[in-house]
């Protein structure tokens, strides 16, 4: 397993953004050097969380940055995230 590098740990919150804006900000954070990303979504249904997590994971994979899912083992397993 690849070691996690928490030197620039980015924790997300999509509450005040459209999905397009949120995904843009995630990608900008990764372009800016984020080394670990935690998806934290407290107000989404399981289906909404999985859908968003799949999109975020596609982006983090392009930058070879691990994705951590906050508090939801089921979501992490559903998308094969790197951690919970």
Model-derived features: where do they sit?
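Conserved N-terminal beta1-alpha1 strand-loop-helix module at the mouth
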Residues: 1-84
């Amino acid at each position: 397993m690849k070691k996690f590098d928490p030197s620039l740990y980015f924790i997300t919150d999509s509450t005040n953004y459209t999905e397009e804006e949120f995904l843009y900000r995630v990608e900008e954070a990764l372009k800016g050097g984020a080394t670990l990303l935690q998806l934290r979504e407290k107000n989404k249904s399981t289906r909404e969380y999985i859908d968003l997590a799949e999109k975020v994971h596609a982006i983090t994979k392009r930058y070879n940055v691990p994705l951590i899912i906050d508090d939801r083992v089921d979501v992490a397993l559903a998308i094969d995230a790197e951690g919970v």
